[in-house]
A protein has these predicted regions:
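Signature aromatic-anchored transmembrane alpha helix within multi-pass, membrane-resident enzymes
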Residues: 1-12
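Short, charged low-complexity linker/loop segments at the C-terminal edge of domains
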Residues: 157-167
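Extracytoplasmic
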Residues: 14-38, 43-158
């Protein structure tokens, strides 16, 4: 019995010691930045948004497709995702686990994929522009040991397929 208790304590200590290097801390950092820097009525879209939402203290649209509407799924699968999120007031997109070129800031545009939850439909995407980044978090280590980073962009207000609008300073 004592051996089992010691094993449980060691396992817990090992888990806790890795928390500082994971998405949990990255999402908290980004959420706190949002709470301090974005207007109270700002709406942010994000996948895996639970921890981030708690600390952001703002409306967050879940972009996983798991806890959203059938209308959202249809928009993702039909190439109308940007129009959908804009119509629902989303102004910012937050994404973790971005590719290396995005982590390095070596990109002009990044097409963030969103899986189609409908049978046979193509995946959707949002095209995010480097010049519209508003937050770049501290790099963190994922559970599988890769370095990741959470980035937030202002969403381009131009409807899909049209030239970007001037976003000002």
């Amino acid at each position: 019995m004592v051996g089992l208790t010691v094993l449980q304590i060691l396992a817990l200590a090992s888990s806790i010691s890795r928390l500082g290097y994971t998405f949990t801390i990255g999402a908290r950092e980004a959420g706190e930045w949002v709470a301090e820097n974005l207007p109270p009525d700002a709406v942010i879209g994000m996948k895996d948004s639970g921890i981030f939402s708690y600390f952001a203290q703002r409306r967050v649209m879940n972009l996983d497709g798991l806890a959203n509407s059938f209308e959202f799924a249809e928009a993702v699968c039909s190439g109308r995702m940007q129009d959908f999120v804009l119509a629902h007031g989303v102004e910012f997109i937050s994404q973790h686990a971005v590719p290396q070129n995005v982590r390095l800031g070596d990109y002009e545009t990044y097409a963030q994929p969103y899986p189609c939850g409908l049978r046979g439909g193509p995946d959707g995407e949002l095209v995010l522009r480097r010049e519209l980044e508003v937050f770049r978090g501290t790099p963190y280590q994922s559970y599988v040991g890769r370095f990741e980073q959470l980035v937030i962009w202002r969403l381009d207000r131009a409807p899909a397929g049209e030239a970007p609008l001037d976003t000002g300073p």
